[in-house]
Amino acid sequence: MFKVRVIPCLDVKDGRVVKGINFVDLRDAGDPVEAAIAYDAAGADELCFLDITATHENRGIMLDVVRRTAEACFMPLTVGGGVRTVDDIKVLLRSGADKVSINSAAVSRREFVKEAAEKFGDQCIVVAIDAKRVKRGGGGERWEIFTHGGRNSTGIDAIEYAQEVVSLGAGEILLTSMDRDGTRQGFDIPLTSAIADSVHVPVIASGGVGTLDHLVDGIRNGHATAVLAASIFHFGEFTIRQAKDHMVRAGLPMRLDP
């Protein structure tokens, strides 16, 4: 049986972590490499870096962060933000990223997913989906894709889009509920399960974690294969080990370091 993954996420701007981190053993809470080393030592299964500056002028800074993290850490790294071309993916992988996350560029040019998967293998291509619940014209609701940090509505159905990008070669979906992100009310379980049940690749649930039970819920009821969280770990509310122990007690298969 697959092991459930617990994945902390770091938002990076101009080479610095922009959301506060409260690890007591960090010398510099704004240094993403130090934060990554702490998460690696704590037993995180993977780490997600999101370059929220996401401009080519800042790419060199992020590449240095990825390179230094890869040299210091054993856990796999997923890096996203501003990835628009095959060359962007190439330099991130060469710098030490294990997987690269594509978001807005995949929405505007679907064939980019296919090109990336064919060149680098689907195992390292993650498509990030930011979805929000919207009203249908004739009544009812659906989940719609938003891009550019949630500012731009696309009118694209999230479930249909997930199926399409997987058919083009996406090896994993990073699914964020914009309705739940930052609320600490738990994952959007109907959204997560709808996407996870519609594709044959792993789905990472993201957005809304406030308790350890929320992590369990994302796997058990959301049918995700991994859970991503930020603030509950960054602010020292829970440790990675506490999260994993809680999930083990709930009957989920976890990788536990000795």
Swiss-Prot record:
Pathway of action: Amino-acid biosynthesis; L-histidine biosynthesis; L-histidine from 5-phospho-alpha-D-ribose 1-diphosphate: step 5/9
A GO cellular component annotation in the UniProt record: cytoplasm
Enzymatic class: lyase
Reaction equations catalysed: 5-[(5-phospho-1-deoxy-D-ribulos-1-ylimino)methylamino]-1-(5-phospho-beta-D-ribosyl)imidazole-4-carboxamide + L-glutamine = D-erythro-1-(imidazol-4-yl)glycerol 3-phosphate + 5-amino-1-(5-phospho-beta-D-ribosyl)imidazole-4-carboxamide + L-glutamate + H(+)
Disulfide bridge map: none
Similarity field: Belongs to the HisA/HisF family.
Assembly notes: Heterodimer of HisH and HisF.
Protein name in the entry: Imidazole glycerol phosphate synthase subunit HisF
Gene name, Swiss-Prot/TrEMBL: hisF
